[in-house]
Amino acid sequence: MKKLNIIFAGTPDISAQVLKDLYKSQHNIQAVLTQPDRAKGRGKKVQFSPVKEVALANHTPVFQPLSFKKNPEVLEQIKQLKPDVIVVIAYGIIVPQEFLDIPRYGCLNIHVSLLPKWRGAAPIQRAIQAGDTKTGVCIMQMDAGLDTGDILNTLEIEIQETDTSQTLHDKFAKLSIKPLLETLEKIEIIKPEPQQGEPTYAHKITKQEGLIDFTKSAWRISCHIRAFTPWPGAYFILDDEAIKVGEFEILYQNTDNRKAGTIIDIYRSGFDIATSDKIIRFRQLQFPNKKMLNIVDILNGKDLDKYIGYKLG
């Protein structure tokens, strides 16, 4: 395999894992691009992005432009490095055509969906929310559009019924390096393939989307909860408070035709609520300003029986 000079662009954990794996290859990481440092937490302490932490640990130069319009000098610095390839995954900053034109073999984007399905910001969450049974990693030749570039390589994976956005994210973090290295190995001869099929869009997640609609089927609610775990978290409103849900299971048919959203019963093992077709049992709940707890632990300090028969929403 030919040794390539690579610039890497990414910001969150998933990007950091791919970068770690890329360092283990024979390729040369010339520089890393990541978002600017942010003040986080109650103390507003400045924190580096996960990608920056990995880059610094490997003594690699780091560029952190606010944008390429505000920091055009970064483009010039990248040009001077004359990279063969720029690899991009979850960078979070819009790149201009001038950026795309710099590397010899162009810019490769690692996108975690089977394009053209779920173009955009939240492909993992939207795939689970929609009830998809498969997804994958696409290595895409970047162009000026939103995830519209030609496909260079694909790795397909199944979405399990127990997968959440977190577990699927972790799978992608581990698996993405394989199709990337395969693509880099064949970069001089690989034939780009235009995306085939009708595109769908993975719009950015909002906090309000976590609200559970109990008039839907138990399966749809399951997809909803798993899609929004861990963020923003699925929840229902009880006494004007947002109660986040944790572990759950789908039980029997709603044979008594209880109205969807009715709290059927509360046991030490769970909090049962009617959906449009079945009963769903929540084994864990999180009340405002509290930790996620098992129902048995909540019952030790809170009277929940008064809510039996109460209809949510």
Curated annotation (Swiss-Prot):
PROSITE patterns the record matches: GART
One Pfam match: Formyl_trans_C
Transferase keyword on record: yes
InterPro entries named among the record's database cross-references: Fmt (IPR005794), Formyl_trans_C (IPR005793), Formyl_transf_N (IPR002376), Formyl_transf_N_sf (IPR036477), Formyl_transferase-like_C_sf (IPR011034), GART_AS (IPR001555), Met-tRNA-FMT_C (IPR044135), Met-tRNA-FMT_N (IPR041711)
Binding site for (6S)-5,6,7,8-tetrahydrofolate: S113, L114, L115, P116
Keywords: Protein biosynthesis, Transferase
GO terms of molecular function: methionyl-tRNA formyltransferase activity
Reactions that this protein is recorded to catalyse: L-methionyl-tRNA(fMet) + (6R)-10-formyltetrahydrofolate = N-formyl-L-methionyl-tRNA(fMet) + (6S)-5,6,7,8-tetrahydrofolate + H(+)
EC number: 2.1.2.9
GO CC, alphabetical: cytosol
Listed PANTHER family: METHIONYL-TRNA FORMYLTRANSFERASE (PTHR11138), METHIONYL-TRNA FORMYLTRANSFERASE, MITOCHONDRIAL (PTHR11138:SF5)
NCBIfam families to which the protein is assigned, alphabetical: fmt
Its job: Attaches a formyl group to the free amino group of methionyl-tRNA(fMet). The formyl group appears to play a dual role in the initiator identity of N-formylmethionyl-tRNA by promoting its recognition by IF2 and preventing the misappropriation of this tRNA by the elongation apparatus.
Family: Belongs to the Fmt family.
Descriptive protein name: Methionyl-tRNA formyltransferase
Organism: Francisella tularensis subsp. holarctica (strain LVS)
Lineage summary: Bacteria, Pseudomonadati, Pseudomonadota, Gammaproteobacteria, Thiotrichales
